[in-house]
Amino acid sequence: MSVIHPLQNLLTSRDGSLVFAIIKNCILSFKYQSPNHWEFAGKWSDDFDKIQESRNTTAKEQQGQSSENENENKKLKSNKGDSIKRTAAKVPSPGIGAPPIYSYIRNLRLTSDESRLIACADSDKSLLVFDVDKTSKNVLKLRKRFCFSKRPNAISIAEDDTTVIIADKFGDVYSIDINSIPEEKFTQEPILGHVSMLTDVHLIKDSDGHQFIITSDRDEHIKISHYPQCFIVDKWLFGHKHFVSSICCGKDYLLLSAGGDDKIFAWDWKTGKNLSTFDYSSLIKPYLNDQHLAPPRFQNENNDIIEFAVSKIIKSKNLPFVAFFVEATKCIIILEISEKQKGDLALKQIISFPYNVISLSAHNDEFQVTLDNKESSGVQKNFAKFIEYNLNENSFVVNNEKSNEFDSAIIQSVQGDSNLVTKKEEIYPLYNVSSLRKHGEHYS
């Protein structure tokens, strides 16, 4: 049975008039017009052929290896002293049995003037720069593609709207001027680094105008470095016992972090003090399922060891609330940040959904989630939910009318697209955060 591939992420413009959605290797654009009317505003697909690139690279390596083989033939002899010709290259061609290749699009960000959209493509480990033109039939136009040697994992945009900070899979951080001309071969040196995979990065400024880069990694570390003098480490934030998957910044001093621990951490990043922790383990327990059982080789005799991790934590822009979700669960948890007790966190609300949450984003005082709705029966729905703060009720509520109309817009926009309408077994892996957890084998 074919279904529309679930949405992997959402990003909304400041005024809410534009929404960008990721499905596989595509970015869909929608215009939002009140009340609850959506208009399809174009699609961009990453047509970079990673398989063909792999074949081309292999062919070049084989050609070079064949030349080396010819030179080495003089040195190779049989037991009888006869020359042996070796014409086969050492480098194998990709073929049957090779692992599947997934061309994810990640890390959607808008510049502050919203004239450009920045994203990352797994297909060629690149940073994508789009022009955003709301008057055009297709609002996105790819302008530049900066390729890296390692996959970009997280990005942050500087205030000048031209500098993008990129954290990669192998622990290096780079600074790119998106007005520059992309290099044919990546030669840039990193501005700072970790010894582990980077998971998040934020470029922030203190009240005195000094800039800092905050980075988190798989090794439980949060590092604060001066910018642009990134060789100067301001401080480390210690407290996590497992990987840090996501960080977010509040106003002034506040930093929030989460990951493989069963706690949310609140920090004063200026002083390095851990202000508070919020243990959510009892709250999430009813939402855990078989997907949270530890891998068989790390299980006990009763097969009841569970492992869970926060996939994303994000703060409301104007309100004292922060939301997060645990990977492969059907809820988001909203916490209130105390204004009296500095950095103190308290439960505000838990919002449940019919399917697992895939992504969480924020637009002003609205939270947005995308859902793993591949098991939806009948007409496919519940692609995303828009969650608004109701001042009168002092609580967050799902705007069902807006969400339902968005479902209809998604269905209409992908009709006839054989890439986005796919078999269930061909859906991209949607739960990758748990793979960051280290077990005994990583320390041996």
UniProtKB/Swiss-Prot annotation:
<feature type="repeat" description="WD 7">
    <location>
        <begin position="308"/>
        <end position="354"/>
    </location>
</feature>
<feature type="compositionally biased region" description="Basic and acidic residues">
    <location>
        <begin position="71"/>
        <end position="85"/>
    </location>
</feature>
<dbReference type="GO" id="GO:0005634">
    <property type="term" value="C:nucleus"/>
</dbReference>
<dbReference type="InterPro" id="IPR001680">
    <property type="entry name" value="WD40_rpt"/>
</dbReference>
<comment type="similarity">
    <text>Belongs to the WD repeat TRM82 family.</text>
</comment>
<dbReference type="InterPro" id="IPR015943">
    <property type="entry name" value="WD40/YVTN_repeat-like_dom_sf"/>
</dbReference>
<comment type="pathway">
    <text>tRNA modification; N(7)-methylguanine-tRNA biosynthesis.</text>
</comment>
<keyword id="KW-0597">Phosphoprotein</keyword>
<feature type="repeat" description="WD 5">
    <location>
        <begin position="193"/>
        <end position="237"/>
    </location>
</feature>
<feature type="repeat" description="WD 3">
    <location>
        <begin position="100"/>
        <end position="147"/>
    </location>
</feature>
<feature type="repeat" description="WD 1">
    <location>
        <begin position="1"/>
        <end position="47"/>
    </location>
</feature>
<protein>
    <recommendedName>
        <fullName>tRNA (guanine-N(7)-)-methyltransferase non-catalytic subunit TRM82</fullName>
    </recommendedName>
</protein>
<keyword id="KW-0853">WD repeat</keyword>
<dbReference type="InterPro" id="IPR028884">
    <property type="entry name" value="Trm82"/>
</dbReference>
<keyword id="KW-0819">tRNA processing</keyword>
<feature type="region of interest" description="Disordered">
    <location>
        <begin position="55"/>
        <end position="91"/>
    </location>
</feature>
<keyword id="KW-0539">Nucleus</keyword>
<comment type="function">
    <text>Required for the formation of N(7)-methylguanine at position 46 (m7G46) in tRNA, a modification required to maintain stability of tRNAs; its absence resulting in tRNA decay. In the complex, it is required to stabilize and induce conformational changes of the catalytic subunit.</text>
</comment>
<feature type="modified residue" description="Phosphoserine">
    <location>
        <position position="93"/>
    </location>
</feature>
<dbReference type="GO" id="GO:0005829">
    <property type="term" value="C:cytosol"/>
</dbReference>
<feature type="repeat" description="WD 4">
    <location>
        <begin position="148"/>
        <end position="192"/>
    </location>
</feature>
<feature type="repeat" description="WD 2">
    <location>
        <begin position="48"/>
        <end position="99"/>
    </location>
</feature>
<feature type="repeat" description="WD 6">
    <location>
        <begin position="238"/>
        <end position="279"/>
    </location>
</feature>
<dbReference type="InterPro" id="IPR036322">
    <property type="entry name" value="WD40_repeat_dom_sf"/>
</dbReference>
<keyword id="KW-0677">Repeat</keyword>
<dbReference type="GO" id="GO:0043527">
    <property type="term" value="C:tRNA methyltransferase complex"/>
</dbReference>
<comment type="subunit">
    <text>Forms a heterodimer with the catalytic subunit TRM8.</text>
</comment>
<dbReference type="GO" id="GO:0106004">
    <property type="term" value="P:tRNA (guanine-N7)-methylation"/>
</dbReference>
